[in-house]
From Swiss-Prot:
This is Hydroxymethylglutaryl-CoA synthase. GO terms for biological process: farnesyl diphosphate biosynthetic process, mevalonate pathway; isopentenyl diphosphate biosynthetic process, mevalonate pathway. It comes from Methanopyrus kandleri (strain AV19 / DSM 6324 / JCM 9639 / NBRC 100938). InterPro entries: ACP_syn_III_C (IPR013747), HMG_CoA_Synthase (IPR004656), Thiolase-like (IPR016039). GO terms for molecular function: acetyl-CoA C-acetyltransferase activity; hydroxymethylglutaryl-CoA synthase activity. SUPFAM superfamilies: Thiolase-like. CoA binds at residues 204, 244. Keywords: Acyltransferase, Isoprene biosynthesis, Transferase. Interacts with acetoacetyl-CoA thiolase that catalyzes the precedent step in the pathway and with a DUF35 protein. The acetoacetyl-CoA thiolase/HMG-CoA synthase complex channels the intermediate via a fused CoA-binding site, which allows for efficient coupling of the endergonic thiolase reaction with the exergonic HMGCS reaction. It catalyses: acetoacetyl-CoA + acetyl-CoA + H2O = (3S)-3-hydroxy-3-methylglutaryl-CoA + CoA + H(+). The keyword Ribonucleoprotein does not apply. The active site is at residues 85, 117, 239. Belongs to the thiolase-like superfamily. Archaeal HMG-CoA synthase family. It is an enzyme of class 2 (transferase).
Length: 350
């Protein structure tokens, strides 16, 4: 899908809770071999939301940063879409909370999206379509989650909290969208039924037929459509469920480590689900120079991938410092014990 009109990112923002738990702390409780865990998942620690944080508060913080960089009146935002698989309410949209918090209400459309870890990129596609068609001036797309892993499950080492937001428009772009491509199938690799507190894994479906197949098909489809190859990109961002998968899929597609390593943050923050690939994207934008081309490929269980190509403009240097960089959130951390973590994540039921 190639936009018929110029469209792209006007402002972007990230947010990561300051609390962290080290892999060693989790391993000590469950008697796991921490060296095997860290080498297998390529992760050191993960973010933990405080008792007063949820995907809505994370979305609000990221949105405020995006609007600050966009330098727009929030009233000009015509659509807000929040992608998450951990909304604080079963029946009440997160998008309206964000709209009110940033002063965008009441003349706009808003909705919540759910497609596992790629709901945020689906929101970007929708906003881009509305903006390019002329139906709205600006759209705000957000991916935010407070992921859960069952006590003792390997997922507990990676399921984390964080999010990113993007103001989509046609003028004053910091990154122009060249195109987007999606690949979608019905693959039962990961799910959580209504009423279940924690998700379940699909075993043999979780690797090659899910993550790798979808990301590779989406990335190749986009590059073929745009007549681009891996060497045409300065940065490549892939969904980061752990540190091993994005590096492996990058090699499979022909990307070099220097294109990928600057965008990998999972080792320091964990898998933020809907925020995962988008946080990697903000890491690239935080250091990109005008003219740089960035590939972003999300993945959501169930299953699907959205791929994008963006070209950074000169305006990035004007607005980058108008909101906190992702690195500032990664450095601002307070470590907690497993007991504190269990309390914050409400794993203890009374």
């Amino acid at each position: 899908m190639i936009p018929s009109e110029r469209v792209g990112i006007v402002g972007y923002g990230a947010y990561v809770p300051r609390y962290r738990i080290k892999a060693e702390e989790i391993a000590a409780v469950w008697g796991d071999d921490v060296d095997s865990i860290k080498s297998g998942l390529m992760i050191e620690e993960k973010s933990v939301p405080s008792e007063t944080e949820d995907s809505a508060t994370i979305a609000v913080e990221a949105a405020k940063n995006a609007v600050a960089r966009a330098e727009i009146d929030p009233k000009d935002i015509g659509a807000i879409y929040v992608g998450s698989e951990s909304p604080p309410y079963a029946v009440k949209p997160t998008a309206t909370i964000v709209a009110a918090a940033i002063g965008a209400t009441p003349d706009l459309t808003a909705a919540d999206y759910e497609f596992a870890c790629k709901a945020g990129t689906a929101a970007i596609q929708t906003c881009a379509g509305l903006v390019a068609s002329g139906m709205i001036k600006y759209g705000l797309a957000i991916g935010a989650d407070t992921a859960q892993g069952a006590p003792g499950d390997p997922l507990e080492y990676t399921a984390a909290a964080g999010g990113a937001a993007f103001v989509i428009g046609r003028k004053k772009l910091v990154a122009e969208m060249e195109g987007t491509y999606s690949y979608t199938t019905d693959t039962p690799d990961f799910w959580r039924r209504e009423g279940q507190p924690y998700p379940r894994h699909g075993g043999r479906f979780t690797g090659a037929p899910a993550y790798f197949k979808h990301i590779i098909r989406a990335a190749r489809g986009l590059m073929e459509e745009l007549d681009l190859s891996p060497e045409d990109f300065d940065y490549a961002v892939f969904h980061q469920p752990n540190g091993k998968f994005p590096r492996k899929v990058a090699r499979s597609l022909g990307f070099e480590p220097e294109q990928v390593e600057p965008t990998i943050v999972v080792d320091r923050v964990g898998n933020t689900y809907s925020g995962s690939s988008l946080l990697g994207f903000t890491a690239a934008l935080d250091r990109a120079e005008p003219g740089d081309r960035i590939l972003v490929v999300s993945y959501g269980s169930g299953a699907g991938s959205d791929a994008f190509s963006f070209v950074v403009t000169e305006r990035i240097e004007e607005v980058r410092e108008k909101a906190p960089l992702l690195e500032e959130y990664l450095e601002d951390r307070v470590y907690v014990t497993y007991g504190e973590y269990a309390k914050m994540k409400k794993k203890l039921k009374f």
